[in-house]
A protein has these predicted regions:
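C-terminal scaffold of the Radical SAM
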Residues: 1-39, 56-258, 262, 268
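Residue-identity detector for glycine
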Residues: 32, 40, 44-45, 50
Length: 268
């Protein structure tokens, strides 16, 4: 049976929510999943009612990643109505200057709007993404971001904190190479990591995985499935799968209409 569905990116919130619904409806139909909608109706599936897995007092976790710069109140309500019950919001920092430096299309105020709309739409399980090692970010700026996030009302149930990875041939790489931007050195990033870890643990978040912290009972099932080497199937460009002990990666080329059938890389 399916225990989790994760709609990641890229930026899923950049496409029309009707397309997200179409994808989910196809999964529900093929897997026989019945999702109870906010209005009390269902999609006519067979196996799962109210997002609950058969024969288990446990709900299917259905997550979507959203960018505050491409998210509307209406979109969030549509996500909720089609069965999504977990939201991951890509904030990265509450410092607007830092957000500009890394090319984010949103500011902190837009994040606050997104968070408020998510609560109004009925989302209780919300993750907030932050980042370490950002250009111009020191422990003082990181501390301010952490304080702002843990003091949100209601508090986020999950916080992820990742290190910045500079990809080749990107604008940020060009700006770093030209000397326009500079990154914290490894020692500074380590200090930021340990400061962040201690801060979140003191604020009641369990450090259950390298970059992830959760309130009790809100650990990401998707993350845990990956760490526990459970099987998962990825669909779409650059999606990864893990089946029968073998990891697969779909092509990153957008020219192929069937990326799962072309240039798939296999990892033993």
């Amino acid at each position: 049976f399916i225990s989790t569905i994760y709609i990641g990116g890229g930026t899923p919130s950049a496409i029309k929510p009707e397309l997200i619904k179409k994808i989910l409806d196809k999964i529900y139909d093929v897997a026989g999943i019945e999702i109870e909608k906010n209005n009390g109706t269902s999609n006519g599936g067979k196996k799962v009612i109210g997002n609950e897995m058969p024969d288990k007092k446990e709900k299917i976790e259905i997550t979507i990643e959203v960018n505050p710069g491409t998210t509307t109140k209406n979109n969030l309500q549509m996500y909720k109505n089609c069965g999504i019950n977990r939201l991951s919001i890509g904030l990265q920092s509450t410092d607007d200057d830092i957000l500009k430096k890394i090319g984010r299309i949103h500011n902190y105020e837009q994040f606050l709007d997104t968070y408020k709309w998510a609560e109004e739409a009925g989302f209780e399980n919300i993750n907030v993404d932050l980042m370490l090692g950002l250009p111009g970010q020191d422990i003082g700026i990181l501390k301010n971001s952490l304080e702002n996030v843990v003091n949100l009302k209601p508090e986020p149930k999950h916080i992820s904190v990742y290190s910045l990875i500079v990809e080749e041939n990107t604008k940020i790489e060009q700006r770093i190479n030209s000397g326009e931007l500079s990154l914290p050195d490894d020692e500074e990033e380590r200090r930021q990591y340990h400061y962040m870890k201690n801060f979140l643990e003191l604020n009641g978040y369990k450090h259950y995985e390298i970059s992830n912290f959760a309130k009790l009972g809100f650990e990401s099932k998707h993350n845990m499935n990956c760490w526990e080497q459970k099987q998962y199937v990825g669909f779409g460009v650059a999606a990864h799968s893990y089946v029968n002990g073998v990891r697969y990666a779909n092509t990153t080329c957008l020219l192929y209409t069937s990326p799962s059938q072309r240039d798939r890389q296999k990892y033993s």
